[in-house]
Amino acid sequence: MSEAVWHDGEDVVLRLYIQPKASRDKIVGLHGEELKIAITAPPVDGKANAHLTKFLAKQFKVAKGLVHIEKGELGRHKQIRIESPVQIPTEIKAII
């Protein structure tokens, strides 16, 4: 099991490194002991967090309210909990 992604009961917990202002939204892959995700939103006024939440909700096929930022609200390093995901993206399945 990876340090970047693990199961906690029915939930999935992700340790992320976020790259804001990227050319497109993408799960890049492992970045040290974290999962790197590139997002197009700038890191201003919570826009990157809102965009990240929406992107992850779409990837895991859950409502945005089921994606929680547990740590790192104001930084690039974050810990995210996804409650009872319907699907696990292929890029993440490969490292679990």
UniProtKB/Swiss-Prot annotation:
GO cellular component, one term: cytoplasm
Disulfide bonds: none
Gene3D superfamilies according to UniProt: YggU-like (3.30.1200.10)
Highest rank taxon of the organism: Bacteria
InterPro entries noted in UniProt: DUF167, YggU-like_sf
Pfam families: DUF167
Any coiled-coil regions, as ranges: none
SUPFAM superfamilies (alphabetical): YggU-like
HAMAP family assigned: UPF0235
Family the entry assigns: Belongs to the UPF0235 family.
Protein name as annotated: UPF0235 protein VIBHAR_03581
Originating organism: Vibrio campbellii (strain ATCC BAA-1116)
